[in-house]
């Protein structure tokens, strides 16, 4: 296990590991225990009672956080003709087709989110091996394969985040920055919790939201009382 720095150790002493704090208390603690000198990201982690190996217990989607994440997302849109013009008008950072496919194949990745119109997916599909492992492949479930490119770009720029359960049943989602007001972090936190509760698979048995923690980039994790999120 990696050795923790002195600042981290001191910060961790402020957190009672056996205690599940209210969402508001947890956010306050995360800000108090942040040791980074930069505006650290605040991330929520949900351990869910699902079996991701089963197709009917996969959880994946996207949600627009009311106060965004504090990160400016660079959006690449694969589209042609009028749809390309709409994407540019909506504020997409990069818009094109074959030219950007070639750039990516040559190692260009100066973007954070990829959107594609359905008619472009035949070409974009060639990038599956490159974009897939990075979590950048457009997908209808997250609203990134669509003809409504204006809505897609607007939502991403407004603070849309994608979520996907991993092999261990966990979901990690950024909910803002330590510079955010407490109330805004809590509202973002509750928004993603509510979204995940609504996404509960019918086949999931037992306790669904088993454990929730919140942490800053370089700070200790803080357990959260699930009942304060709903």
UniProtKB/Swiss-Prot annotation:
Lineage of origin: Bacteria, Bacillati, Bacillota, Bacilli, Bacillales
Entry protein name: Large ribosomal subunit protein uL1
Originating gene: rplA
SUPFAM superfamilies in UniProt: Ribosomal protein L1
Native source species: Bacillus cytotoxicus (strain DSM 22905 / CIP 110041 / 391-98 / NVH 391-98)
Function of the protein: Binds directly to 23S rRNA. The L1 stalk is quite mobile in the ribosome, and is involved in E site tRNA release. Protein L1 is also a translational repressor protein, it controls the translation of the L11 operon by binding to its mRNA.
GO biological process: regulation of translation; translation
Signal peptide: none
Gene Ontology MF term list: rRNA binding; structural constituent of ribosome; tRNA binding
Entry GO CC: large ribosomal subunit
Source taxon at top rank: Bacteria
Family listed: Belongs to the universal ribosomal protein uL1 family.
Keyword annotations from UniProtKB, A to Z: Repressor, Ribonucleoprotein, Ribosomal protein, RNA-binding, rRNA-binding, Translation regulation, tRNA-binding
Xref: Pfam families: Ribosomal_L1 (PF00687)
Subunit structure as annotated in this protein's UniProt entry: Part of the 50S ribosomal subunit.
């Amino acid at each position: 296990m990696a050795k923790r720095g002195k600042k981290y150790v001191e910060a961790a002493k402020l957190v009672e590991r056996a205690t599940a704090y209210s969402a508001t208390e947890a956010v306050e603690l995360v800000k108090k225990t942040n040791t980074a000198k930069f505006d650290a990201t605040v991330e929520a982690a949900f351990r869910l009672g699902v079996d991701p190996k089963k197709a009917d217990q996969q959880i994946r989607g996207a949600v627009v956080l009311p106060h965004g994440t504090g990160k400016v997302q660079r959006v690449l849109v694969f589209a042609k003709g009028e749809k390309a013009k709409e994407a540019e008008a909506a504020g997409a950072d990069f818009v094109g087709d074959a030219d950007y496919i070639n750039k990516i194949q040559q190692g260009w990745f100066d973007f954070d989110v990829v959107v594609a119109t359905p008619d472009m997916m035949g070409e974009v599909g060639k990038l599956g091996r490159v974009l897939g492992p990075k979590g950048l492949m457009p997908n209808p479930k997250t609203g990134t394969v669509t003809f409504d490119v204006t809505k897609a770009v607007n939502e991403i720029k407004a603070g849309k985040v994608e979520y996907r359960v991993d092999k261990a049943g966990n979901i990690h989602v950024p909910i803002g920055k330590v510079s955010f007001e407490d109330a805004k972090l809590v509202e973002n936190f509750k928004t993603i919790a509510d979204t995940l509760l609504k996404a509960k698979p019918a086949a999931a048995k037992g306790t669904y939201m088993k454990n929730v923690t919140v942490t800053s980039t370089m700070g200790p994790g803080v357990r959260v009382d699930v009942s304060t999120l709903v």
